[in-house]
């Protein structure tokens, strides 16, 4: 797996703040300030990748703002607008047993107890009560709550999820 394939998009740079190189971030994480846990970021746009080091960060009125080493003025900061923020997957904190990062579930094949392939996980959605797998396959889109009542096993090695779910549900 190449370095690029092993990185996860975590948000993007949506604008600048002030004149000293601060940037506004749109985070694709549950808690926007969790991006501050990663000192090294990869910024990607139009096939170009820039590696940057986080100098400082803060949440102001619910908005994540960051400062990178070497980015000290508004013009240079503005040139980074629109870049996607990627973090190496191996930098993520380990999960507890039966806990998974969404990025690890996307792309997994979902089969039911009859070994019928339901499709692949294309995305997940948060409903408040629980997360829901969005599965795309030859049977159309299937939504399965990601709870133990329906999910029997998650095998990260074989990238397979076994669900107690019929085609007629």
Curated annotation (Swiss-Prot):
Keywords: Chaperone, Cytoplasm, Ribosome biogenesis, rRNA processing. It comes from the Bacteria. Residues 97-169 form the PRC barrel domain. GO terms for cellular component: cytosol; ribosome. GO terms for biological process: maturation of SSU-rRNA. It is found in: Cytoplasm. InterPro entries: PRC_barrel-like_sf, PRC_RimM, RimM, RimM_N, RimM_N_sf, Transl_B-barrel_sf. An accessory protein needed during the final step in the assembly of 30S ribosomal subunit, possibly for assembly of the head region. Essential for efficient processing of 16S rRNA. May be needed both before and after RbfA during the maturation of 16S rRNA. It has affinity for free ribosomal 30S subunits but not for 70S ribosomes. Binds ribosomal protein uS19. The PRC barrel domain binds ribosomal protein uS19. This is Ribosome maturation factor RimM.
